[in-house]
Amino acid sequence: MSAGKIVQIIGAVIDVEFPQDAVPKVYDALKVESGLTLEVQQQLGGGVVRCIALGTSDGLKRGLKVENTNNPIQVPVGTKTLGRIVNVLGEPIDEQGAIGEEERWAIHRSAPSYEEQSNSTELLETGIKVIDLICPFAKGGKVGLFGGAGVGKTVNMMELIRNIAIEHSGYSVFAGVGERTREGNDFYHEMKDSNVLDKVSLVYGQMNEPPGNRLRVALTGLTMAEKFRDEGRDVLFFVDNIYRYTLAGTEVSALLGRMPSAVGYQPTLAEEMGVLQERITSTKTGSITSVQAVYVPADDLTDPSPATTFAHLDSTVVLSRQIASLGIYPAVDPLDSTSRQLDPLVVGQEHYDVARGVQGILQRYKELKDIIAILGMDELSEEDKLVVARARKIERFLSQPFFVAEVFTGSPGKYVTLKDTIRGFKGILEGEYDHIPEQAFYMVGSIDEVLEKAKNM
């Protein structure tokens, strides 16, 4: 190990001087004698390297001795990490003792080559009606949950983990990137109560941590997921929240003195996003299905951060504040959400026709809303009145009680199979349920529950 000393400290950015013949490589991990880990970001010349601190730089002083580990950050991987909470360096933070891993992997790795990659068109059923119908997920695909503050990204993600972990019984890795510590705590207890904790590895780098931790914690989680994939498993990789990953990159970029680009983001935004997203892929050995929550600043989907993320995804689930304000949860916008899987060759003709029919009716209702607002319902033709009635039923039928929200809604969660979902919406489109009041469609599971509820109204 070669040793150097700290020559400058500016917040999370630390300059370390090494002998000219032993300058560390970019991304090497350095250990300060106080126990803090640094990651090399730039070589400034003259034996000086500029590093980002992966932890608080409080109490550091110039002249402290720094050792070069000659490797990037190495984190524990494998089944020993299941049921445990670790930080960006792979150190356990759940007070359950050492992990006792057999193997450690570097967090900086190259993406699988073209020959190794595979694409599948197998669908992954989530049990959430609106998602399975409008924006179905592919096994080994990438899904983005887009939404502003407080429209339900984390709750949707927790429901997906619960449903898929229980129904699909595979391993999951959850990376909490720059989110609230309270959510991390809720999440841990939710997994524990659902008895799926022994199938989930949790990696947390929360809001209160320095930007270096928040920037690298996604890579730590991804490295653990890659290990499971390379063992031939189908893994689920959840990231909450990709926007905070971008934001940490912006902070690090500014600290390193790079010129900002559009809206103050780092000039390397697209490249940083690409490096992460290209590694989240399925190979011929195993698959990684990823679900990523993406915060949309000021509800503006054209902001560079969400816009850069869009390009990498197979399915986009857009959560809308307008739908949430109607009390319809999950607040998924059926007209804005898309999926590459919604193709008759993949999902079958019936599913495709029903999904497009639902979108068609909702689009027509959206156009009629202006007329209704000015002239009232009575001025509509009989045909349009029918469209409005069916659209309102569809809107309500797209809502669903969640297992993870039982505490708030007071009604038990529902898992709806794809077959039941298609049957229900097909019936509404064909007018089989025109005689049933629209209130019966609100917050239920399958169409059979609607009929049951209507009897008691």
Curated annotation (Swiss-Prot):
Known CDD domains for this protein? ATP-synt_F1_beta_C, ATP-synt_F1_beta_N, F1-ATPase_beta_CD
Keyword annotations from UniProtKB, A to Z = ATP synthesis, ATP-binding, Cell inner membrane, Cell membrane, CF(1), Hydrogen ion transport, Ion transport, Membrane, Nucleotide-binding, Translocase, Transport
- Annotated residues that bind ATP are located at G147, G148, A149, G150, V151, G152, K153, T154
Q: What is its EC number?
A: 7.1.2.2
State one Pfam family annotation. ATP-synt_VA_C
Q: What's an example of a GO molecular-function annotation for this chain?
A: ATP hydrolysis activity
Q: What is its main location?
A: membrane
Note the InterPro entries from the entry.
AAA+_ATPase (IPR003593), ATP-synt_VA_C (IPR055190), ATP_synth_F1_bsu (IPR005722), ATPase_a/bsu_AS (IPR020003), ATPase_alpha/beta_chains (IPR050053), ATPase_F1/V1/A1_a/bsu_N (IPR004100), ATPase_F1/V1/A1_a/bsu_N_sf (IPR036121), ATPase_F1/V1/A1_a/bsu_nucl-bd (IPR000194)
- Localization (cell): Cell inner membrane
**PROSITE patterns from the UniProt entry:** ATPASE_ALPHA_BETA
What's the superkingdom here?
A: Bacteria
Assembly notes: F-type ATPases have 2 components, CF(1) - the catalytic core - and CF(0) - the membrane proton channel. CF(1) has five subunits: alpha(3), beta(3), gamma(1), delta(1), epsilon(1). CF(0) has three main subunits: a(1), b(2) and c(9-12). The alpha and beta chains form an alternating ring which encloses part of the gamma chain. CF(1) is attached to CF(0) by a central stalk formed by the gamma and epsilon chains, while a peripheral stalk is formed by the delta and b chains.
What task does this protein carry out? Produces ATP from ADP in the presence of a proton gradient across the membrane. The catalytic sites are hosted primarily by the beta subunits.
> What is the recorded name of this protein?
ATP synthase subunit beta
Please tell me the species this chain comes from. Haemophilus influenzae (strain PittGG)
